[in-house]
Amino acid sequence: MAEDSEIGPDPSLLLVDDDEIFLNRLARAMEKRGFLVSRAASVAEARVLLEGGAPAFAVVDLRLEDGNGLDVVDALREARADARIVVLTGYGAIATAVAAVKMGATDYLSKPADADEVTRALLARGETLPPPPETPMSADRVR
């Protein structure tokens, strides 16, 4: 279970998923872990909630009935650059994961993801990558 100190001073979390049962179950589990949860079942609902203020954390389903979850990721990233965003989907594909991360998602999980996995992904503090070498190795040198 997450400690409040791990979550930080702003425990706000937006959950966006059109599977109402999953959304409610995950919301209850995340509240028990110390998050202050807002729920949206569509891109449109998420946009309305974002107008009231962007959360510190978000979990967004990729495929929603009224659009693409990446639209929510993009809107959230514009509203709050430091938000930690996890994208969920039942349709795992590398290309989609790459697109989600390029748009600003912190992580990408396949459904069914449990609350512990989601919490770990939201709170993970990835290490920064080392800078590229000044003289990168060419493909010819690797042969």
Language model feature labels by segment:
Residues 132-143:
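AAA+ ATPase active-site-proximal loops
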Residues 95, 112-122:
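C-terminal output helix
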Residues 42, 68-71, 89:
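Acidic catalytic/metal-coordinating carboxylates
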